[in-house]
């Protein structure tokens, strides 16, 4: 069996800073057909808003054309957008949920 002579072990330190994930706004957009109570239900069901918060956001959507539901990392934001849009279609509403990079 051969013996290895002096073997140097080189350890390299790699310093990497973890970057926070890019954040995305999840937004509900106004339309002329989705009932206000359905929008409130969506906000409570998918964004854990209490009734007053949901009503306030629903009124912002109605009056300003869109309303902020929350800010999340991309994966969570994308999932919420998908879930809300699917729920709206299942209930025959044209409500549109989108995401915007912060």
Swiss-Prot record:
It comes from the Bacteria. One of its GO terms (biological process) is protein catabolic process. Gene3D superfamilies: 3.30.1390.10. Transmembrane segments: none annotated. InterPro entries: ClpS, ClpS_core, Ribosomal_bL12_C/ClpS-like. Binds to the N-terminal domain of the chaperone ClpA. Belongs to the ClpS family. Involved in the modulation of the specificity of the ClpAP-mediated ATP-dependent protein degradation. This is ATP-dependent Clp protease adapter protein ClpS. It comes from Shewanella frigidimarina (strain NCIMB 400). The gene is clpS.
